Every structure is written in C-alpha cells, then in structure tokens.
A protein has these predicted regions:
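Metal-dependent phosphodiesterase/phospholipase catalytic core, i.e.
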Residues: 1-108, 112-122, 143-144, 150, ...
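C-terminal active-site rim and adjoining tail of enzyme catalytic domains
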Residues: 121-212
C-alpha cells in the first residue's frame, strides 16, 4: 500500500486553535471532558509552580520523558537524539527544578548521551514488557541509572530485589486496573506511573482526588 507522507507540522499559534479536551474517549471512558488546548511544556510547569506557591502546597516532582527513536527518518522527520536531548536539557535547566525532576526514556542512546553530557539530571530507564533478562537490558546502558521504570507485567519480587541491589528505585508503568495497582503496592515499589491516580489514591490513602 502506497502511503503519502503529509507535513502536519504547525506553529503553536495554530495548535492553540484546537480544543483537545472536550471530546469523549472510547479508550478512556472515565476521562473528564474539559475544554482545553495543548499547553507548551514551559507554560505547564510555570502554571503548576505558581499554583503550588499560591496555595501553600508541597513542591511538585516532575517525571518528563525524552521521546526519541532510533528509526528511519531520524534527522529528517524529527531531530537526532543528541540534538533533541540537548534542546530538552537547555529548556529543563531554565526551569531550575533541581532534584524534583526525573528524566525518563526508552532510548538507551538518549540516556547514555544525557548521562555523559548532562550528569546533573536524575535519569530513569524505561523498559517494555519484551525487554528480556535484567542483565541483558541493563547492559545496553553505560551506567546505572537512579531509576528503573519497567512495564508492570514484568515487575515482580525478583526484579524489585535486583533494583535494590543495584541501588536503583523501581517505578513501574502503567498499571491501571485496581488489582494491578494493588500488586505493585504490595511489592513495595518506590512510585507508580498510572493513568488513574484516583484509583491509586484510594488504595494507598483511602480516598480519591476530587473531580475537576
């Protein structure tokens, strides 16, 4: 099947014209439908920081993903991983988040480059359900990251123990069902990435956050 590649890149002034929050989702039927636009990362962080300060809340921690990919089109349809990492780090430095920021990625090239060029950042290694043996996927890195973030389906007592032995925190993604969230909590993981933080709050604290 012949496919036509369309250039859909738009300036942010055009992106702002589109409501991306009002339409219900078949995939996420419990999603709150709120009229909104896609924010710039800088605007989002500024909003959160100002809100927390105004309300006298505890500082927020950020987990931001570097989405680079070793595939045909890199350097043409999207930036090379090293250029992209450098631009992201320049931006992140400007926000002065310190140890409240963790940068995660599946791309071992990006993680290795970032560790070498920007060692001040806390890094998290994302691995999927088909990552294979612990020693094999860890060998792809030239260093031991502060965090390991495996798919929840491969997260078990043995993996938690290996992370402890390596001095890494373990932060599985993305359990959404209550029973999967409960299993992660029972394993004693350090944090959990989920699309349903309200369900996690109900398990860990006995209450859910109010609806927006």
């Amino acid at each position: 099947l012949d496919m036509v590649m369309l250039d859909i890149r738009m300036p942010y002034s055009e992106v702002l014209k589109y409501d991306v929050g009002s339409r219900p989702s078949e995939v996420w039927p419990e999603k709150a439908c709120v009229k909104t636009v896609k924010p710039l990362a800088s605007d989002l962080i500024d909003f959160v920081e100002n809100y927390v300060k105004e309300k006298g809340l505890s500082p927020v921690r950020y987990n931001i993903e570097i989405k680079s990919k070793d595939a045909k089109g890199e350097g043409q349809n999207w930036p090379t991983y090293d250029r992209f990492v450098s631009e992201c780090c320049k931006f992140l430095h400007s926000k002065h988040l310190g140890d409240r920021l963790v940068v995660q990625s599946f791309d071992v090239r990006a993680l290795n480059y970032m560790h070498e060029k920007y060692p001040e950042f806390i890094l998290s290694y994302l691995v999927d359900a088909k990552a294979g043996e612990f020693d094999a996927f860890m060998a792809k890195l030239k260093f031991t990251p502060q965090w390991l973030s495996p798919h929840f389906s491969i997260t078990d007592e043995a993996l938690v123990q290996k992370c402890r032995e390596k001095g890494m925190k373990i932060v599985p993604w993305t359990p959404d069902k209550p029973e999967d969230l409960q299993r992660m909590v029972d394993l004693g993981v350090d944090a959990i990435i989920t699309n349903y933080p309200d369900r996690l709050l109900m398990i860990t604290r006995g209450y859910a956050a109010p609806a927006p």
